[in-house]
């Protein structure tokens, strides 16, 4: 699947998605909205992101600029003129219930973050219970309720820098400061380093990846990170959850697959030890393939002890 900005040639296909969605009983759209004029404007201003699967557009979302919505009193005042509305989210009926809507929202938020916005907000019909639950899962907070355009809406908003603010604020003394101090003390990063940041899907490596991304974004060090994740044979549902988590943490991950689990299954004795060694070997090879001179692994104290005892 490919995320990309919609083009004029996609107009009819996207309008077809809107039409299909309008037939659902929970949808507030009709024949007059969204119209081709709105869709065309979104395309021309690069404000319409779509998801393509085998040449077919299966989902779309817009980053709208609506003065009426943007100036609602219920929004947090500190984001005034620094927030953008997410609008016209649509997923092809045959692709629903696969988490695609949530991924579209996360992709849109990543785009808006790069454009300098601090927050996003969204109006959703209270009848669309699936969407209401999705926003809570994605960390949106309910700002209130309003009546607009003849409908009742639930209003949600999200700080795009919530994770960064937590790490450098609430957890500054326990996470961010020790992280930076360790890099400085042990000279872990040098100018020009190309570092393969290896993500397993667990909280240790996820946190490490997020903080290294912050170090890069804040230009604390002159290095190039490559975020990689190996699939050693995870179940499909587990892999999808990990992909979702990477989107949620705004980490641009490259994925590659191996047969480690199948190979280890044939080993009767000490499978965990061999699994660890094999996975590490694949990570080293991938890092070299990407031209990296270092790798970064996230370990807690128990991991460190096990690695020292089983080098």
Show which residues each predicted segment covers.
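Conserved acyl-donor/pantetheine-binding loop and adjacent beta-alpha core of acyl/acetyltransferases
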Residues: 60-88, 96
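Conserved beta-hairpin
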Residues: 47-62
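Conserved GNAT-fold acetyl-CoA-binding loop/helix
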Residues: 19-41
């Amino acid at each position: 699947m490919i995320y990309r900005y919609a083009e004029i040639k996609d107009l009819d296909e996207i309008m077809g998605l809107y039409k299909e969605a309008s037939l659902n009983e929970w949808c507030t759209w009709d024949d007059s909205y969204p119209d081709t004029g709105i869709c065309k404007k979104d395309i021309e201003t690069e404000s319409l992101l779509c998801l393509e699967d085998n040449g077919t557009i299966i989902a779309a979302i817009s980053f709208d600029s609506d003065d009426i919505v943007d100036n609602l009193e219920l929004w947090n005042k500190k984001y005034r003129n620094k927030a953008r509305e997410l609008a016209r989210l649509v997923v092809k009926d045959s692709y629903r219930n696969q988490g695609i809507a949530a991924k579209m929202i996360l992709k849109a938020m990543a785009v808006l973050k790069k454009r300098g916005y601090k927050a996003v907000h969204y109006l959703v019909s209270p009848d669309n219970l699936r969407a209401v639950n999705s926003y809570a899962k994605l960390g949106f907070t309910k700002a209130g309720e309003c009546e607009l355009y003849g409908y009742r809406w639930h209003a949600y908003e999200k700080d795009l820098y919530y994770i960064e603010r937590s790490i450098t604020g609430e957890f500054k003394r326990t996470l961010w400061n020790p992280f930076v101090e360790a890099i400085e003390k042990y000279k872990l990063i040098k100018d020009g380093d190309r570092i393969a940041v290896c993500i397993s899907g667990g909280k240790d490596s996820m946190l490490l990846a997020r903080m290294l991304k912050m170090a890069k974004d804040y230009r604390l060090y002159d290095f190039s990170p490559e975020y990689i994740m190996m699939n050693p044979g995870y179940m499909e549902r587990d892999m999808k959850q990990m992909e979702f988590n990477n989107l949620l943490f705004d980490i641009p991950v490259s994925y590659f697959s191996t047969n480690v689990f199948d190979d280890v299954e044939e080993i009767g004795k000490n499978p965990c030890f061999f699994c660890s060694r094999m996975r590490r070997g694949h990570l080293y090879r991938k890092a070299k393939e990407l031209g990296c001179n270092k790798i970064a692994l996230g370990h807690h104290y128990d991991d460190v002890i096990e690695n020292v005892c089983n080098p």
